Amino acid sequence: MSNNINFNKNPDSSVSISKMDVIIPFTPDVPCDNNGQRMWWAFLASSMVTFFGGLFIILLWRTLKYLWTVCCHCNIKNKEAQKVNNPITIQADGTTKTGNEKEEAPASEVGWMTSVKDWAGVMISAQTLTGRVLVVLVFALSIGALGIYFIDSSDPIESCQNFYKDFTLQIDMAFNVFFLLYFGLRFIAANDKLWFWLEVNSVVDFFTVPPVFVSVYLNRSWLGLRFLRALRLIQFSEILQFLNILKTSNSIKLVNLCSIFISTWLTAAGFIHLVENSGDPWENFQNSQPLSYWECVYLLMVTMSTVGYGDVYARTTLGRLFMVFFILGGLAMFASYVPEIIELIGNRKKYGGSYSAVNGRKHIVVCGHITLESVSNFLKDFLHKDRDDVNVEIVFLHNISPNLELEALFKRHFTQVEFYQGSVLNPHDLARVKIESADACLILANKYCADPDAEDASNIMRVISIKNYHPKIRIITQMLQYHNKAHLLNIPSWNWKEGDDAICLAELKAGFIAQSCLAQGLSTMLANLFSMRSYIKIEEDTWQKYYLEGVANEMYTEYLSSAFVGLSFPTVCELCYVKLKLLLIAIEYKSEQRESSILINPGNHVKMQEGTLGFFIASDAKEVKRAFFYCKACHDDITDPKRIKKCGCKRIEDEHPSTLSPKKKQRNGGMRNSPNCSPKMMRHDPLLIPGNEQIESMDANVKRYDSTGMFHWCPSKEIEKVILTRSEASMTVLSGHVVVCIFGDVTSALVGLRNLVMPLRASNFHYHELKPIVFVGSLDYLRREWETLHNFPKVFILPGTPLSRADLRAVNINLCDMCVILSANQNNIDDASLQDKECILASLNIKSMQFDDSIGVLQANSQGFTPPGMDRSSPDNSPVHGLVRQASVTTGSNIPIITELVNDSNVQFLDQDDDDDPDTELYLTQPFACGTAFAVSVLDSLMSATYFNDNILTLIRTLVTGGATPELEALLAEENALRGGYSTPQTLANRDRCRVAQLALYDGPFADLGDGGCYGDLFCKALKTYNMLCFGIYRLRDAHLGAPSQCTKRYVITNPPYEFEMVPTDLIFCLMQFDHNAGQSRASLSHSSHSSHSSSKKSSSVHSIPATNRQNRSSKAREARDKQNATRMNRMGPEKRWFTDEAENAYPRNIQIKPMSTHMANQVNQYKSTSSLIPPIREVEDEC
């Protein structure tokens, strides 16, 4: 056959051809093809023969197999028909066997074909390491083959290539040999050979592998259908899943969409590149156009997007026909895939990723209840400037993305705060925030949730998840309910020694309120001490000026200098206050067994050890450094405390590992209190102290305290025994008591009244000092709480409502020492402004009541009550002579009240005469400054305070809970009730711990300092004489005016300076010893003792509740009480034993009021006329 060669390069030039000839244009690009003959059909034929030949063989095999099955089925039917006549043979061993069993036996054996098939399945399965490696390798080689195609696409579609000289052809050959072997494994492992043959991956192999072998044989290369390798990209998501790179559904879906879109795009571009560069076969390939592969990619994109610029278009008929069909499918794919891809990318977690730790910088993880309010409160305290330089990064982890306000807050603190979206219950998210290298994990609770138990359960699950991931991580979590703390003890890796802490908001809130019942305003002072507040300077002489000066003080810890070693605590305390301008209130003391405990104002017998940690009240952390730097040789003559800095003396502290910031020493210094070493404020064994005689008699058969000796205890009482009707309450003289107004019903969450009662029943009070507690509220609710209250003495219940004035008058609310208003319904209301409506209404209701001041006095005197100021039996130099007692009031506004609030902004409704702005922070409002309002939000600062020093939380709990210990918590977790214990020297020693009291300056041993005296002189005198540590003033709001005022409201001044001038109406906050005469000499003790006491006994007269007639089991004791009442002005009480068995019903319910004598009436009138001049002091004899 003759060939006509046309040397014209113009593709449009006409050529003369015969019908039977195949004429192709010759160009220098194909120099080896002297004839100009194309061999594309040979490459294509190899693929088509392989595909259709294999398909024919498979179909033929299936047909033959089907026919064979039909034939075998007919034979089986014939055999079943013969089975009836088949005899059963009996073998020698006695078994029977038919003839067919010989044929069925081999059927149960596995043939070699099945074994090979299983082996091939394991080889290509991603379930094994070999299979995963093979699958990933095939995918990688497919992408490599596609890359070779991209390189070769710049060459002509068909060209002559020498296999031994063409490097890319050799590599492609090696890839395809591997593909052929892998195809064989897949074919062997396939269960359905027909469907396998029609799979996309199989079709790709048919049209890419055989042409390579043809290329070697013909020494030609045809670009052909090698672009089909792009279809392997569809498996990209599967490969990433095999490698555990893709784990979420969104990421898998995104990769799937992208891989399908890109593979379809590249494959279609490859087909257009082939037909446009080759031309139409029926046009003798003369209508081709030179297009690069990437121009075809561009053409397909503008076609799918329906833009169609027209700069590049298809000229061949095959290309145009393909574009017609592709635009239909491509447009649909583009319109559906691209928006979905963009949506998935746009919806990807903005706060995904992982935390990158910075060398030399710690980080903490904060999770739980993450809201704008909780985060802002936390950051405000954690990053406060008074903490010095906080080189800690805060990583927040929450499963909900932050709103715009919270996001803005994070951006304002971007240098120290990062946010990641995720859950601590997911180990993957814990790995993202590097929880294993975090310094601590803090879990915030939702204080306003409707179901506190559910919230606690969520936080406990978070603790379990975190501890399960990394058992050594330190966790500080907030808990809402006290009884849920016990569940944390069930976590094996929960370790108090390593700094794990649970801040129970209900326990601390109730403890703060209970301490206010003992010393009004103390809750405000303590809340301010453990919160970081900036100093706000006010020039005007207003009460806010003095209040804010005290607010700037906080609690810090620092190691004491070696200059203090060997000195007693009062000596060191005085030196720190006078010289260093620091207030030392407690130390961490190590016993001989190297067990550490926190001692609050321990007394003279405790000497400072080397490396003793002190708890200071100061305005910032830099001031506290003075206690560490103080050197007697260098700083003894310095009067300006600011000049006390590190000196050049060789001191032990230089070698002490205390170069850390004082905020972090406790956690890294290993001085954490162990769970077995309870923070009992034990100073000494009372049996071993000189001057404290041993107990003469000890009744071991009487249980008066719980098993730890920390609380007064009584046998369980049925609730019916303590219920008072309104008439019974009216006939029962109640004075100096605590009225607890509680709102709640059957469905309300429990507030945990035990946490309120326990501090009021601490064993460092004598029995007669215990204030009776009267609960006024729903009986249905109180029944639910009673299980935790039935072991406490002097607790009564008046069923009713706090909004009923008749109920309030029945309990003599005008004679109470404190009225507490609580609500268990606060979190069930969605509107935040209405959450406190019940408490606010009850508070305003009480303040608007009016009372006749004579009624309470008459009732009290008829039952043995001495009006405040009439009891003058204590010596003038006794410190209890100045202890505060509430005088009779005539208006409800003078009743001491503390109201619990949920919403801070509602504090504006408590006082109608204040001018507080609704946006004013809680601590700046008048009710909070006066100690008449308390909100749980003030406890948020304890999270950061506990992180920087875990002993701070121990100190707080010891101060406000009355001495709750880890042992007691473990006991309550087991029995949910206090267990009584016999009095032993060890348990009695636990009573010897200090307590908070308020001291009046109008009368008593400090009266000379009350009128214009300096606070520092009072501080030193009280400390030296009575070991009494003063730490604040409770002052009348208008005292600075210097003129008499009708306002009886007071406010708190924390840690006044030495030269602060006092006024006679001031009340002093002080830490009082259990034995308040411990600081006096023996002569003073003898003088302070009552003359009727034995010389071996010390007087322990202290302020107490109003005394009523007590019923004793002994008639002799009853006669002594009667004699005492008859000679009340002398207060000559009989000698008492330590372990007097007090009657359970110390307060009779039904008492007839006797007619008052003329002598008593004169005393009452005298009291009424001089009540404003007599200081509110009253004492009774010590019961213990």
Swiss-Prot record:
Q: Which Gene3D superfamilies match?
A: 1.10.287.70, NAD(P)-binding Rossmann-like Domain
Q: Give TM segment ranges.
A: 40-60, 133-153, 169-189, 194-214, 255-275, 290-310, 322-342
Q: Which residues lie on this side of the membrane: Extracellular?
A: 1-39, 154-168, 215-254, 311-321
The topology of this chain with respect to the membrane is:
Multi-pass membrane protein
Quick check: keyword Nuclease in the entry?
A: no
Q: Which residues lie on this side of the membrane: Cytoplasmic?
A: 61-132, 190-193, 276-289, 343-1184
Which biological process terms from the Gene Ontology are attached to this UniProt entry? potassium ion transmembrane transport; response to auditory stimulus
| Name of the molecule in the record | Calcium-activated potassium channel subunit alpha-1a
Protein source organism: Danio rerio
| This protein's encoding gene | kcnma1a
